[in-house]
């Protein structure tokens, strides 16, 4: 093959086997005619086809500008300025008219009134400290001798803390007596009236056996009074101690039966009383129903 027929910019591509050529689409096997031309972007392709999908002439005539990249923030300092700012400046040496700076240790020792004075060996090791000790500031008071300072530290004692006074505890009388709210207090007259009213209602119930006054009048109050006479009052004559010898001899001579007769009889229990009332009411009911059945 002659050399003239070769394309100067063509690159040799390996030949594909027949089996792969049949399976790969033809547009992939074709090489672009322009070689390494740049592919248009999506924005450029849309700009070229704008007339197909845009109806407004104003939008069709305007051209979309590419998006500008964000501007980077400008540095606050230039490299030279940053180097100048970040580099610590050298201290100016004190001139002949400048006052020498005092050491902070000397000031702290003067303020705290140290007991031990500065030894000459330590002063020779720290010339700046010794110089500061020789020339104290005018505003600082002179340092007292160590003995006075020691005595002062010993004599000055901290003030005793005032003892906390305990809170007065409430007395037993105040703790035992409960405080009633003012709304629950009632006068003695109200209480006595309530008790007397309740006693009257209870007495009326037992006297009339729970019946209405009209029914009690129809049945006869005498029977009710006779039925209520079974209750014996507890307020009987109290047996007082005999003071005479004759009374003692008479009490010793009586028999057991006489002593039982002399005892104050106790009242009928509530259960027995209710049983009698129920039995009496049941008898009245039977007496009413019997004549009606005979008629």
UniProtKB/Swiss-Prot annotation:
Disulfide topology: none
Region (Disordered): 117-148, 160-191
Keyword terms of this UniProt record: Cytoplasm, Cytoskeleton
One cellular component (GO) term of this entry: cytoplasm
Quaternary structure, from the entry: May interact with CSPP1.
PANTHER family associated with the record: AGAP005440-PA, PROTEIN FAM110A
Protein name as catalogued: Protein FAM110A
Organism listed in the record: Bos taurus (Bovine)
């Amino acid at each position: 093959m002659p050399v003239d027929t070769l394309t100067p910019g063509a690159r040799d591509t390996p030949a594909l086997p027949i089996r792969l050529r049949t399976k790969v689409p033809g547009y992939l096997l074709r090489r672009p005619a322009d070689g390494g031309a740049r592919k248009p972007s999506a924005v450029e392709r849309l700009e070229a086809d704008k007339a197909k999908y845009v109806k407004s002439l104003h939008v069709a005539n305007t051209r979309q500008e590419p998006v500008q990249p964000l501007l980077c923030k400008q540095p606050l300092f230039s490299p030279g300025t940053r180097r100048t700012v970040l580099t610590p400046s050298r201290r100016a040496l004190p001139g002949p008219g400048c006052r020498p700076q005092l050491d902070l240790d000397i000031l702290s020792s003067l303020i705290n009134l140290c007991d031990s004075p500065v030894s000459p060996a330590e002063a020779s090791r720290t010339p700046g400290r010794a110089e500061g000790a020789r020339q104290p500031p005018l505003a600082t008071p002179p340092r007292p001798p160590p003995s006075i300072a020691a005595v002062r530290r010993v004599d000055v004692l901290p003030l005793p803390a005032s003892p906390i006074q305990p809170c007065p505890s409430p007395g037993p009388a105040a703790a035992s007596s409960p405080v009633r709210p003012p709304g629950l207090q009632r006068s003695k007259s109200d209480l006595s009236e309530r008790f007397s009213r309740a006693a009257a209602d209870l007495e009326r119930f037992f006297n009339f056996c729970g019946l209405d006054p009209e029914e009690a009048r129809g049945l006869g109050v005498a029977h009710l009074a006779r039925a209520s006479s079974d209750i014996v009052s507890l307020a009987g004559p109290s047996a007082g101690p005999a003071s005479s010898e004759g009374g003692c001899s008479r009490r010793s001579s009586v028999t057991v039966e006489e002593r039982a007769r002399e005892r104050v009889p106790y009242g009928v229990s509530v259960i027995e009383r209710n049983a009698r009332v129920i039995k009496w009411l049941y008898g009245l009911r039977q007496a009413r129903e019997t004549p009606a059945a005979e008629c």
